[in-house]
Design a protein with these regions (language model features):
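Generic secondary-structure microfeatures
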Residues: 21-27, 52, 60-62
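A short acidic, glycine/proline-enriched capping/turn motif at secondary-structure boundaries
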Residues: 62-65, 91-93, 113
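Non-catalytic interface/targeting segments
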Residues: 1-42, 97-113
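C-terminal structural segments of small proteins and small subunits
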Residues: 79, 83-108
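A short, acidic, amphipathic alpha-helical segment used as a generic capping/interface helix at domain edges
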Residues: 40-50
């Protein structure tokens, strides 16, 4: 469960993180870097796609500056992931907390801008 989020920091299950991360079902990858910083591409989420969650949540940053192209969302869905939720990171945290107990879910968060 995500306990809190503020610009540059997220608290998950009692632990604080200050770098972009991916929450998998059984672990947290806390060094998530994208090839192009504020632009996400298929290579940046290959491991997520390989795990085929039912839901992928993408937090685009405090101000929502990370870009998620519609073409990428289409490619994600065509890979078998049923639902893709793209929101500013604060809103994405709320979505994650609503869904994580009842769905096979993975969430990727940009924590700053």
């Amino acid at each position: 469960m995500i306990e809190s989020y503020k610009f540059g920091q997220i608290s998950i299950n009692g632990k604080n993180y200050s770098s972009d991360l991916i929450i998998f079902e059984d672990y947290i990858y806390d060094s998530w870097w994208r090839k192009e910083g504020h632009n996400i591409c298929i290579d940046d989420i290959k491991e997520i796609i390989d795990k085929k969650p039912d839901v992928l949540i993408i937090g685009t940053g405090y101000f929502g500056l990370m870009k998620v192209p519609q073409k990428l969302i289409k490619n994600i869905k065509s890979s078998g992931i049923k639902q893709v939720i793209v929101k500013k990171s604060g809103e994405a945290c709320n979505e994650y907390n609503k869904l994580y107990k009842t769905n096979k879910i993975i969430a990727a968060f940009h924590l700053t801008c």
